[in-house]
């Protein structure tokens, strides 16, 4: 959510140009919409409808399921008012997005793997659903569940690049190994052009020997593919959903909040890699 927000907003301070971004939620928890303060009871068709019948139905289009910048901004401002009932002034001007569209998910998506289990081409459903959006956005970011089920496989089949966040914890590298194995399987069988954009260390604690060890092991295996930027373990990041906005929006692009700054630094790195890929 923070990367998508930062890339869509852009920042002169960090040298990031604004891009048109589509953020796709493939996690049945539906946390993407919640992070932007969206009351999921107010949205129309979601990823579940698009996934289950959109490919087979000309009556349902991608744009019917997406939440645009105005809707997201209104939701964030409404959430801000609920979180700050005693303040006479309204939400700050920086509680807003532009050039960002969200394709939300909800718990109904959790049953899609069973529904699609026997369908031909089940691993390409997302790719087909997103085909009409390829020329409308500069960047499409797909947020996946942690499990390596059919939803994640669909994301890998539709994507050009994979970004892997790793918590700086003991079992992190084991889980990453399983994901890398899945990526290679998809490369061999369905999507040979799938590449690794990078690996992001998250939940990092300063002066933690464990965090240092996990980071060193990641760099030993993946070298420059590990981003220099790291996301710290932070109370402000954990509490940002209470404000109904990602932390890069709630704190706006400044260099005073360390958690917000870490995401902007990461977005700067990711933006450069994306630009290099596009130019290549």
Question: What are these model-predicted stretches?
Answer:
Residues 1-280:
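P-loop NTP-binding core
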């Amino acid at each position: 959510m923070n990367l998508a927000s930062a890339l869509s907003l852009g920042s002169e301070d960090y040298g990031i140009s604004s891009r048109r971004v589509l953020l796709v939620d493939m996690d049945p928890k539906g946390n993407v919409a919640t992070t932007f303060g969206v009351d999921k009871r107010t949205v129309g068709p979601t990823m579940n409808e698009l996934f289950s019948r959109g490919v087979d139905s000309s009556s349902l289009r991608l744009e019917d399921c997406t939440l645009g910048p105005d809707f997201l901004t209104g939701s964030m401002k409404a959430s801000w008012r609920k979180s700050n009932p005693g303040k006479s002034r309204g939400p700050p001007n920086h509680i807003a997005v532009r050039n960002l569209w969200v394709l939300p998910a909800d718990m109904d998506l959790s049953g899609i793997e069973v529904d699609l289990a026997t369908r031909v081409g089940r691993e390409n459903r997302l790719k087909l659903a997103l085909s009409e959006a390829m020329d409308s956005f500069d960047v499409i970011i797909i947020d996946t569940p942690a499990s390596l089920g059919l939803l994640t496989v669909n994301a890998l089949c539709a994507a050009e690049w994979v970004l892997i966040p790793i918590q700086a914890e003991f079992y992190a590298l084991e889980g990453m190994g399983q994901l890398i194995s899945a990526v290679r399987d998809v490369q061999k069988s369905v999507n040979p052009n799938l590449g690794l954009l990078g690996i992001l260390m998250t939940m990092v604690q300063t002066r933690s020997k464990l965090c240092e060890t996990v980071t060193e092991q990641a760099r030993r295996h993946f070298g420059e593919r590990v981003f220099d930027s790291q996301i710290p373990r932070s109370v402000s990041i954990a509490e940002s959903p209470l404000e109904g906005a990602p932390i890069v929006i709630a704190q706006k692009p400044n260099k005073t909040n360390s958690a917000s700054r870490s995401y902007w630094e990461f977005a700067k790195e990711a933006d450069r890699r994306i630009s290099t890929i596009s130019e290549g």
